[in-house]
């Protein structure tokens, strides 16, 4: 069983607006609404791959109700902690004429200490049947930057392998907690190691640097490829993989 954790779950709304211009009134030609947040997206992908998965995290208000109902409709097993504040809504605006994407993200709900404690208790319970726990996405307001790190350390002691996909300070301190895998994108990895990448060698150096911070395995993603460092017993492997183009 894989458990995905989404602290900042959202309702994702995508609007298609051809020839969009700021300061003008437009009518969307299409709209799509779905439950979102990185951890939920991971759970959705695992479900489609027929991998046993349960999604957990924080959900509040009517937006939280909508998130949970959407997951139930998709037959994604879930067990979220209900919180008093409203979960966020994220809006993406697609202009197919210009080939442009604009995104607007809310900060997310305020979370009470007792709500976080309830989530940690739930993780302890779910870890009994979990092989992996995936922590993905940003943290809501008032949640300490070391939340992921402390949760990872606790689960490591319980023999559960943890995956971390976040950014900024939560990523930096989370890597030091020695997760099984950390998966930043290029921008997040550049921020973590303090330099920009311009050629393949920069990515390979960054893999080692991030592993030295504490991560057992590292995957740096780009739009069409990724660079990885994986340890298997006494073997250390580095690779680059290209993603094939898939027609919708």
Give, region by region, the residue ranges found by the protein language model:
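Glycine-rich phosphate/adenosyl-contacting loop at the front of the ribokinase-like
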Residues: 1-56, 65-66, 237-246
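Conserved phosphate/ATP/ADP-binding segment of small-molecule kinases
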Residues: 145-233
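Short beta-strand scaffold segments in enzyme catalytic cores
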Residues: 44, 91-93, 226-230
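Conserved N-terminal subdomain of the carbohydrate kinase-like
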Residues: 24, 48-130
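Hydrophobic anchor at the start of a short beta-strand
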Residues: 2, 51-53, 78, 162, ...
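Short acidic, glycine-rich surface-loop motifs adjacent to enzyme active sites
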Residues: 129-142
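Small-residue (G/A/S/T)-rich helix-start motifs and N-terminal tracts that mark the onset
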Residues: 24, 32, 52, 73, ...
């Amino acid at each position: 069983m894989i458990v995905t954790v989404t602290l900042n779950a959202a309702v994702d709304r995508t609007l298609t607006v051809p020839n969009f211009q700021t300061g003008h009134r437009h009518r969307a030609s299409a709209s799509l609404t779905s439950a979102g947040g990185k951890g939920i997206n991971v759970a959705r992908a695992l479900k489609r791959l027929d991998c046993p998965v349960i999604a957990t995290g924080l959900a509040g208000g009517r937006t939280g109700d909508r998130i949970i109902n959407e997951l139930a409709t998709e037959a994604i097993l879930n067990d979220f902690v209900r919180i008093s504040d409203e979960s966020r809504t994220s809006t993406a605006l697609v202009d197919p004429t210009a080939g442009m994407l604009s995104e607007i993200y809310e900060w997310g709900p305020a979370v009470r200490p007792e709500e976080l404690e309830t989530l940690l208790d739930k993780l302890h319970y779910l870890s009994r049947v979990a092989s992996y726990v995936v922590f993905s996405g940003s943290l809501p307001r008032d949640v300490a930057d070391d939340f992921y790190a402390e949760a990872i350390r606790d689960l490591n002691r319980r023999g559960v392998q943890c995956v971390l996909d976040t950014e900024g300070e939560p990523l930096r301190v989370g890597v030091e907690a020695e997760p099984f895998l950390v998966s930043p994108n290029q921008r997040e990895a550049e921020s973590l190691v303090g330099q920009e990448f311009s050629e393949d060698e920069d990515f390979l150096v960054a893999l080692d640097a991030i592993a030295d911070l504490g991560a057992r395995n590292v995957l740096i993603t780009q739009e069409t490829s990724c660079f990885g460092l994986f340890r298997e017993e006494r073997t250390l492997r580095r690779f680059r993989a290209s993603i094939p183009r898939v027609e919708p």
